[in-house]
Design a protein with these regions (language model features):
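Short glycine-enriched loops at secondary-structure junctions
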Residues: 56-60, 108-109
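Short glycine-rich phosphate-binding loop at a beta-alpha junction
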Residues: 49-55
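Glycine-rich loop at the start of a catalytic domain that most often binds anionic cofactors/ligands
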Residues: 62-69
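Acyl-thioester C-C bond-transforming condensing/cleaving domain
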Residues: 2, 45-47, 69-197
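Conserved donor sugar-nucleotide recognition element shared by glycan-biosynthetic enzymes
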Residues: 32, 59, 83
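Short catalytic helix/loop segments, enriched in acidic residues and glycine
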Residues: 23-43
Length: 197
């Protein structure tokens, strides 16, 4: 198998103009578009250079809204890790010659959406999730992550895995907290596995 790890480089990184709890309502599309334009600018490119688009939503709608014409799109959606998977997919697409400049984006108006009455977006009432998952409380990221944790604990043992998962939470918080956009202050109990557990 060919090693493609050096087939591409990340040359631009950016966020939407506002993140966290927004004063004004913005859609997922607006946040994606802002982040895309900011990343393109950070890379020193033009939107016409982009020929690959990777997003966990409607890539064709985003491309149309931005006025770009990608040769390759990927809308794989696996929840909050989609953009991580898209980075790998973008690398593979570039190595295979499907595109030269890949734009990976993720934008979600989750925090700001809560503050606007009647703005809660939901799936169609006849979707499988609405019919067979939501009535039983199977909703959102906590459920999805807990399934992965349960599997990890089954494979590697409950005692060892609880502490390992606490360390992941601690290291994630330590990296994220110093960022200017962080919405999570330092916990009162400190960054210890005992406090997390």
């Amino acid at each position: 198998m060919q090693n493609i790890s050096r087939a591409a480089a990340i040359v631009g990184v950016a966020e939407a103009d506002e993140i966290g709890y927004l004063e004004n309502r913005k859609s997922d599309l607006q946040l994606n578009e802002e982040a895309c334009y900011n990343a393109i600018e950070d890379a020193g490119l033009n939107k016409s250079d982009v020929d690959g688009l990777f997003a966990a939503g409607n890539t064709l709608g985003l491309a149309e809204h931005m006025g770009i014409h990608p040769k390759f799109t990927d809308s794989t959606s696996v929840g909050g890790s989609s953009f991580v998977i898209h980075a790998g997919h973008a690398l593979a697409a570039i190595a295979a010659g499907y595109c030269e400049v890949a734009l990976v984006t993720h934008g979600m108006a989750g925090h700001s959406r809560r503050f606007f009455e009647g703005s809660r977006e939901s799936g169609a009432a006849n979707s499988p999730g609405a019919q067979f998952e939501s009535p039983y409380g199977f909703i959102g990221a906590p459920i999805n992550y807990s399934m992965a944790c349960a599997r990890y604990m089954h494979e590697f043992g409950e005692d060892r895995s609880r502490e390992a998962m606490a360390e992941v939470a601690i290291s994630t918080a330590q990296v994220g907290r110093p960022q200017p956009q962080s919405t999570h202050p330092r916990p009162k109990g400190g960054d210890t596995a005992d406090h997390v557990l």
